[in-house]
């Protein structure tokens, strides 16, 4: 999800205007980040991370994300252990209420969610890049592109994230949000290419293959 974030936001960008000004092609991303960034200049200079966050490295386990949550972000509403009560179980699965409560105050653009839903307890990725509209067809197409591409890239022998630096993925994300379909992004073996060319010549076919493997008619 992180590796394709730049491409995803570039092809689906749909919020170029904010308060009468033309800003980024997907202005929702910088506006949301700035609107809840309470860090002072001193804290920024000290390296304190913003709560709206793309991340800073590839991870090997979802536990890495929850560990980062604890390491980098203090609770917004701290509660003493004596007031927390006994650990809650949802069937055979731990409820982890406070883990989820804390996780919900950190707005990653791809956020891991632990859902203790009884027999269907699971961990999923909440992809928060998808904009609204402009039409239902656009929404469905953007979602299909994302799911198909994630599936296809995840099935590759050598995953894309092993060939693309995290720094490059972050630059792609910013470029896609800023410049939309006119952005240029970095991609393994191709170097820096126009995102429209990358999507049309390479990624749409991969997304179709991924959807086909999920028995989705394209």
Predicted segments with their positions:
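A glycine-rich, aromatic-flanked flexible loop/lid motif
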Residues: 101, 107-126, 139-143, 163, ...
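Feature representing long, continuous alpha-helical segments
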Residues: 125, 144-148, 205
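Glycine- and acidic
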Residues: 125-134, 186-192
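Extended hydrophobic-aromatic, low-complexity segments
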Residues: 136-139, 158-159
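Loop-rich catalytic cores of soluble enzymes, especially ATP-dependent carboxylate-amine ligases
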Residues: 1-131, 157-161
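Electropositive phosphate-/nucleotide-binding environments in soluble metabolic enzymes
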Residues: 103, 140, 197, 201
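Short amphipathic C-terminal alpha-helix that caps PH/PH-like domains
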Residues: 1-5, 141-153
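Cationic, histidine-enriched alpha-helical/coil surfaces that engage anionic ligands
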Residues: 60, 72-96, 154-218
């Amino acid at each position: 999800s992180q590796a394709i974030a730049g491409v995803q936001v570039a092809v689906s960008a749909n919020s170029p205007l904010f308060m009468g000004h033309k800003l980024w092609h997907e202005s929702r991303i910088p506006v949301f980040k700035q609107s809840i960034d309470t860090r002072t200049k001193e804290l920024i200079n000290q390296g304190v991370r913003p709560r709206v966050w793309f991340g800073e490295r590839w991870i090997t386990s979802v536990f890495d994300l929850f560990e980062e949550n604890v390491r980098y972000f203090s609770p917004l509403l701290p509660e003493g252990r004596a007031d927390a009560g006994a650990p809650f179980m949802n069937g055979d699965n731990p409820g982890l209420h406070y883990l989820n409560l804390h996780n919900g105050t950190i707005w990653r653009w791809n956020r891991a969610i632990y859902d203790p839903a009884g027999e269907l307890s699971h961990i999923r990725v909440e992809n928060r890049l998808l904009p609204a509209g402009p039409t239902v067809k656009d929404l469905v197409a953007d979602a299909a592109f994302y799911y198909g591409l994630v599936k296809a890239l995840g099935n590759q022998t050598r995953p894309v994230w092993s060939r693309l630096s995290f720094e490059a993925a972050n630059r792609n994300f910013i470029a896609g949000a800023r410049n939309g379909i006119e952005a240029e992004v970095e991609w393994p073996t191709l170097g820096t290419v126009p995102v429209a060319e990358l999507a049309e010549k390479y990624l749409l076919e991969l997304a179709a293959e991924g959807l086909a493997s999920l028995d989705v008619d394209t």
